[in-house]
């Protein structure tokens, strides 16, 4: 579509230029130049200038003025790099700008939207009991709830450890023999907290049947295949 418009505009420019070329010899062919001829040339020059500006605005995809403005002789605002457009109709005043910013920043939140869960850095074990007692105390059912609530508030509060990324890793180095009063205590402690895979034995090959497990069938260790197998040798002998 834009290519068609550009080609049409080029044809129009060529036609206007050819008309000007024909009009200039006719205007200067006489011995005297009249005011009518000069005014006609000036009008044609202004029309060419407006046509060039209109073509430029068409290439940019924007139209700064209407056809009535072009016919009446008003200048079409052109896009200049590094300068502001003289047309201030698209600008917002202070009140309109404030209204737009307030509409963007104070946008009402969708209550049905799922909120991201916050990290729980420990939770009081007695928090649920305190909430329940607060609800009962607000109803005013009995005065014993106040005594229980005061005992909970005065008592110590225990918090769960917050989950962390490396909770399954040892954050402290293994204790050495120097950290224990005696070598015997160190050996007892190390055996008690030994890892399960530290005393794992290597699987042995099953040669024959085990004495402790008679349900297992006899299974021999596979022999290394050196050369041809016996079945192939038998087939070769039978073929001979």
From Swiss-Prot:
The modification Leucine amide is found at residues 51, 60. Residues 227-240 have a biased composition (Basic and acidic residues). The modification Tyrosine amide is found at residue 121. Residues 26-41 have a biased composition (Polar residues). GO terms for cellular component: extracellular region. Expressed in the pedal-buccal projection neurons in the pedal ganglion. Its main location: secreted. The modification Alanine amide is found at residue 81. GO terms for biological process: neuropeptide signaling pathway. Residues 1-23 form the signal peptide. Residues 24-44, 72-81, 84-112, 124-147, 124-148, 124-149, 124-168, 131-168, 149-168, 150-168, 151-168, 171-190, 171-199, 210-219, 227-240 form a propeptide. It is found in: Secreted. Keywords: Amidation, Cleavage on pair of basic residues, Neuropeptide, Pyrrolidone carboxylic acid, Secreted, Signal. The modification Pyrrolidone carboxylic acid is found at residue 115. Residues 23-44, 212-240 are annotated as: Disordered. The modification Isoleucine amide is found at residues 207, 226. MMG2-DPs (Myomodulin gene 2-derived peptides) bias egestive feeding programs toward ingestive ones, and modulate accessory radula closer (ARC) muscle contractions. This is Myomodulin neuropeptides 2. The gene is MMG2.
């Amino acid at each position: 579509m834009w290519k068609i418009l550009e080609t049409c505009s080029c044809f129009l420019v060529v036609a206007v230029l050819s008309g000007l070329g024909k009009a200039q010899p006719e205007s200067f062919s006489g011995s005297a130049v009249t005011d009518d001829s000069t005014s006609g040339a000036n009008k044609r020059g202004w029309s060419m200038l407006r046509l060039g500006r209109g073509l430029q605005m068409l290439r940019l995809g924007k139209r700064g003025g209407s056809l009535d403005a072009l016919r009446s002789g008003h200048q079409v605002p052109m896009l200049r790099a590094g300068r502001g457009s003289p047309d201030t109709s698209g600008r917002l005043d202070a009140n309109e700008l404030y209204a737009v910013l307030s509409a963007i920043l104070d946008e009402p939140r969708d209550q049905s939207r799922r909120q991201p869960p916050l990290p729980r850095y420990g939770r009081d074990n007695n928090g649920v009991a305190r909430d329940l007692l607060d609800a009962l105390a607000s109803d005013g059912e009995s005065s014993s709830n106040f005594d229980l609530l005061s005992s909970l508030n005065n008592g110590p509060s225990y918090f769960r450890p917050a989950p962390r990324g490396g909770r399954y890793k040892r954050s402290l180095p293994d204790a050495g023999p120097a950290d224990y009063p005696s070598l015997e205590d160190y050996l007892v402690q190390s055996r008690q907290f030994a890892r399960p895979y530290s005393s794992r034995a290597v699987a042995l090959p099953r040669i024959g049947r085990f004495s402790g497990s008679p349900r297992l069938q006899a299974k021999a260790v596979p022999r290394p295949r050196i050369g041809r197998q016996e079945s192939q040798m038998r087939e070769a002998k039978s073929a001979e």
